[in-house]
Amino acid sequence: MEHKETGCQQPEGPILCINNCGFFGSAATMNMCSKCHKEMIMKQEQAKLAASSIDSIVNGGDSGKEPIIAGHAEVAVAQVEVKTLVAQPAEIAGPSEGVTVNPKGREGPNRCSTCRKRVGLTGFNCRCGNLYCAMHRYSDKHDCQFDYRTAARDAIAKANPVVKAEKLDKI
């Protein structure tokens, strides 16, 4: 009898979440489960942040002068058309040249240029432009025609330009 007098009543049964997620909700979380309630709060906070950032952008950085009202923010998004131009390799080379360009690159399996062994994905590309196995990957093992010394000299000269000061006049 004391329960009826104080006004505390137990619920008749467990209440399912209003989002139909399968969990039980409570009156403290607006008949939502804890997960759905947390997601709803996060969405409201993100909407507030979005509204304040849009307001600061529109007003030129005058944030904090006007109060932000919690609610739904309507945002207009402009559609941007992106046009890409794709040039075919034959168009770049020109129709007058008799060179055929293979868009795939190499035909068939990847093979070492020296021993013709199948290398698959473990092949090593050399600076001379060929593919080699683990045994022939070094330049001294496959008679590489690439001049590493000149390439390194040019790279160092490009990275470190000569700085020369003007001569000073004597007084």
UniProtKB/Swiss-Prot annotation:
Q: So where does Zn(2+) 3 get bound?
A: 126, 128, 142, 144
Identify the residues that bind Zn(2+) 2: 112, 115, 133, 136
Q: Where, by residue number, does Zn(2+) 1 bind?
A: 17, 21, 33, 36
One term of GO molecular function: zinc ion binding
Q: Which intervals hold the zinc fingers (A20-type)?
A: 11-45
Zn-finger (AN1-type) intervals are 106-152
- Source domain of life is Eukaryota
The UniProt induction remark is: By cold, dehydration and salt stress.
User: Gene3D superfamilies, per this entry?
Assistant: 1.20.5.4770, AN1-like Zinc finger (4.10.1110.10)
Alphabetically sorted, this entry's keywords are: Metal-binding, Stress response, Zinc, Zinc-finger
Identify the PROSITE patterns for this entry: ZF_A20 (PS51036), ZF_AN1 (PS51039)
Its biological purpose: May be involved in environmental stress response.
Name by which UniProt lists this protein: Zinc finger A20 and AN1 domain-containing stress-associated protein 8
Species annotation:
Oryza sativa subsp. indica (Rice)
User: What taxonomic ancestry is recorded?
Assistant: Eukaryota, Viridiplantae, Streptophyta, Embryophyta, Tracheophyta
Task: Identify the gene encoding this protein.
Answer: SAP8
